[in-house]
A protein has these predicted regions:
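N-terminal auxiliary segments of SAM/dcSAM-dependent transferases
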Residues: 1-19
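Conserved class I S-adenosyl-L-methionine
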Residues: 55-66, 83
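Conserved SAM-binding loop of SAM-dependent methyltransferases across substrates and taxa
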Residues: 66-79
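Conserved alpha-helix/loop element of class I SAM-dependent methyltransferases that forms part
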Residues: 39-57
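A short SAM/SAH-binding and catalytic strip from SAM-dependent methyltransferases
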Residues: 130-145
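Class I S-adenosyl-L-methionine
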Residues: 170-209
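S-adenosyl-L-methionine
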Residues: 87-126
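A short glycine-rich, Lys/Arg-flanked "PGG" loop and its adjoining helix->strand segment in the class I
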Residues: 146-163
Length: 209
């Protein structure tokens, strides 16, 4: 696979697809969009799918990226449809050149929406999704995707007894526990009662009960 890297005047960001021993990861202006240290991007996506448990029906993938999570979800026979949303057209352009993202554009169970998840989620009906995967960029890059307003929308579009995987990463010392506490506090304010941390996936599993 030839190296993919470029600067976008429209976004003012540098984009780079970085090879690993398995699936490549995306880097935007020096910030990795995938875990690539203790686990590779392929294993990272697999751990997220494992953490959310048995999935079926219709699934929302809030931030497409290179499409790895959407692809693994759509591979499951119990999943009927994966709706995945990506704001950055440059990311989709890179995904189209990444052979490991090919099923994102070829699997008929995957519906890709080019748009802002913060706005697109408002267009879905109440209790539309059985499961949601929310893997946003860092909070300082996309703070609106960690907001109470967005969490209320997640609650609204999720079916009763549905689950959400919310990737939170491993916050630095300066953020510390207050970062996770803030997320959990806003999720509870949005209506979610059952929230647990799954360390191996660096994610919260949230149930609507």
């Amino acid at each position: 696979m030839s190296e993919i890297k470029f600067y976008s005047e429209k976004t003012g960001k540098y984009y780079k697809l970085v090879s690993t021993s398995t699936w490549p990861y995306l880097e935007i202006s020096g910030i990795r969009m995938h875990r690539a240290d203790e686990v590779d991007p392929k294993k990272d996506a697999e751990l997220k799918i494992k953490a959310i448990g048995r999935v079926y029906g219709r699934v929302l993938d809030c931030c497409t990226g290179l499409g790895y999570t959407a692809i693994l979800l759509a591979n499951k026979k119990s999943v009927d449809e994966v709706i995945t949303v990506e704001k950055d057209e440059n990311v989709i352009m890179i995904a189209k050149q990444n052979p490991y993202s090919k099923p994102l554009f070829e699997n008929s169970k995957i519906k890709l929406i080019i748009g802002d998840a913060f706005e697109e989620i408002k267009k879905f009906e109440d209790k539309y999704f059985n499961f949601i995967v929310h893997d946003p960029p860092r909070i300082n890059i996309a703070h609106e995707l960690y907001s109470l307003e967005f969490y209320k929308q997640l609650y609204r579009v999720l079916k009763d007894n549905g689950r959400i995987l919310h990737y939170v990463g491993r916050p630095g010392i300066r953020q510390g526990k207050n970062y996770i506490k803030g997320i959990i506090h806003r999720l509870r304010m949005a209506g979610f009662k059952r929230i647990k941390m799954v360390d191996y996936a660096l994610s919260l599993i949230i149930e609507k009960v």
